[in-house]
Amino acid sequence: MVRRIYVEKKPGLRQEARGLLHELQTVVGVSALEDLRLLNRYDVEGLDEAAFRRAVGTVFSEPQVDDTAAALPAGDCIAFGVEPLPGQFDQRADSAAQCIQLMTQEERPTVRTARIYLLFGPLTAADVDAVKRYVLNPVECREASLDLPERLAAETAVPADVETVTGFTALDRAGLDTLLARLGLAMDLEDLSFLQAYFRDTERRDPTLTEIRVVDTYWSDHCRHTTFSTHLDHVEINDPAVQAAYNRYLAAREEVYGPEKAAQRPQTLMDIATIGAKVLKRRGLLPEIDESEEINACSIHVAAQVNGKPQDWLLMFKNETHNHPTEIEPFGGAATCIGGCIRDPLSGRAYVHQAMRLTGCGDPRTPVAETLSGKLPQRKLAQTAAAGYSSYGNQIGLATGHVAELYHEGYVAKHLECGAVVGAAP
């Protein structure tokens, strides 16, 4: 049996709803919206009535600040809900289920959540659609049904046989290009041609669709830095300062690799990014660098003062950018940006104790109506990304000592989300 409860802040404590109301009226331009209420909806399966009643006042709500109800409040309003996409991690639901299990000391129940919006005023269909577009990011969530489901357990379909891409090894270039578009692959035509040659000459068979999808995923820019490894065959620079820096890079290549090897070695953005450290290492100016088979983050030997005595410690540094993930899913993208930074020194047994966030965004005051097609409003992006970063950092207990927010029209094309951490290990 599925049990349902709605939770809403008490009157006078509904700051989030008032803030969103003001934003929708002034930023989105829905002037006919007179009032707005926000409720959290919990659906629970696998919990008896007595335990459910206990959970209402201990897990789902705080009686001092929340009101609860078994049904949506009556009134002349437009109601709709937003829930995570199937398969999307629902932290609120997961935390609630864990808390209930701690409370009952029994099997963990199934919990599903949704955010319910109640809109008041003489709204047109266009007004309601504008509100939905602003609060609903289709990359991570969808509109939820207001009906009570009969069960919450996901239906498990029997998987079909894995499809073989018959004729793949015999496709000509035009055929590969058609397949590339049909499957919506991240790799380009040259990548797919390389994959075709491998299956034709080495495996001597056609690949399965799963194999192509797996290779496409791990061949993507996010996994193997495809862009940074691209060979720069022709470089044309108009800015004198940038040209001077590029000339220094060319000189550094000859110093590190030697003139003959430098001429044969491809120029890449990755090489440009790492050449400075290679030069310093070659000159013997980096004796403190720790090099081992276990390279999780940049590690430097330091003499740390512990109780007034020097001890040999490793100071670890790690940075990460999550530009595109944050662009399409601001909360999760920014959260996993700092999360990825933390993970690497943490896996080196370091205590991560300090962080930094650099972010670049377009003008958040830009009217929502001017948002480019396929993109989120800059205001929404900036605010939600900040919430995602701070959420992860606060939960793990990490102090972020420096935050810099850069606003420039160039970041409309692609958001900048850069996190960095330092940690230490004895």
Predicted regions and their residues:
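Core nucleic-acid recognition elements
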Residues: M1-P426
